[in-house]
Amino acid sequence: MKTKLLSIFAALTLVACATPVTQTEIQQAKLPPAPKQADIDKEVNTYLKSALNTPDMPTKECAPARKAWARALAFETPKFGWMVVCDIKAKERSGGDSAMKTYMFLFTTNGNYTYDAASFSNINNNVQFLDLIK
């Protein structure tokens, strides 16, 4: 019982440690050029082939790229780049549709990163579009 309580306390403490991204960090961010549509399609399709059981026939809708920051864990240093958000509905092996899932693809100067929106307990601690920050 003590172990469970300590684990819960530790998890809550880490969540409370979410440090906000500062205006200074945003102003000093080095962004790559906006990705071309061909680069976006290549990255999304490569991810789908590795992540889905039947990557041949997914339905996908992707929003245009926007400047953003993201981090997998709320206390990590944010990565700045261009974010593309895609809603993907894969086909089941039986032929039926699976549930729609949202994935985020971040194009940075240090490579590309993929995030599953469902994995964030509070998405505002993990992702933010720069045009929404005042």
Model-inferred region functions:
Residues 18-134:
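Cystatin/cathelin-like cysteine-protease inhibitor module
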Residues 1-18:
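Sec-dependent bacterial lipoprotein signal peptides
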